[in-house]
């Protein structure tokens, strides 16, 4: 009976779309608008993304950043994370950024506003979003860096650590030339969901912790939240039910 119940529950959740958030990073198509597709120095606005057969345009943006650690910048190519923008784009540029600077760079839909990291720079940043979200869209200029991601949970703990390698990401369809580089570089994209981060109950999610180490080759990134599975509160209920069903299945196998 328990096995039958588990199968029925998973089938029901799949029919409602709640199980769409499987433990696997996903690809997506980026729909954007810009006036400069030659030099890629101007504003590049994110309009929507396509995941499978669905289009999403209701995003959750970063509204607060807590700097746990960020290598100090004093001159030149020292330091780690900084606020950066396209040469002709609007937005913040700050070599020695405050938490508010970083939140401003990430907290909008201008893909020309990014966090730029020096090649050997180290940082630990905690990011918080405007509204609950179950998935995250990462963009990395250059497609040659790594970034460690963890979920921050309401009880003060963290989810599992996920190391992203942008050299394996798909191309996002645009390039980016910012004030610190001479020519435009292609941008890669990848989607990550809460299951990827070891979170089975979305109600526990509080924020993201991003980490760069000295051998990660300085990720230059943007991250935007989006609800892919189903809107809240069904997402919370769905993820909780899936987690309970999986636990029940494991207990059955152990008996």
Could you describe each region identified by the protein language model?
Residues 1-27, 218-248:
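Short, threonine-centered small-residue motifs that mark membrane-proximal processing/anchoring sites
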Residues 26-119:
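N-terminal targeting leaders for non-cytosolic proteins
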Residues 128-135:
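Extended extracellular/luminal ectodomain segments enriched in beta-structured repeat modules
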Residues 131, 142-144:
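Short proline/glycine-enriched turn/loop motifs at strand-loop junctions of beta-rich domains
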Residues 135-139, 209-211:
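Residues within well-ordered beta-strands of beta-sheet-rich folds
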Residues 145-156:
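Short, surface-exposed beta-strand/strand-loop-strand elements in extracellular ectodomains
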Residues 159-229:
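Terminal, low-complexity interaction segments
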Residues 247-255:
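C-terminal membrane-anchoring or membrane-association module
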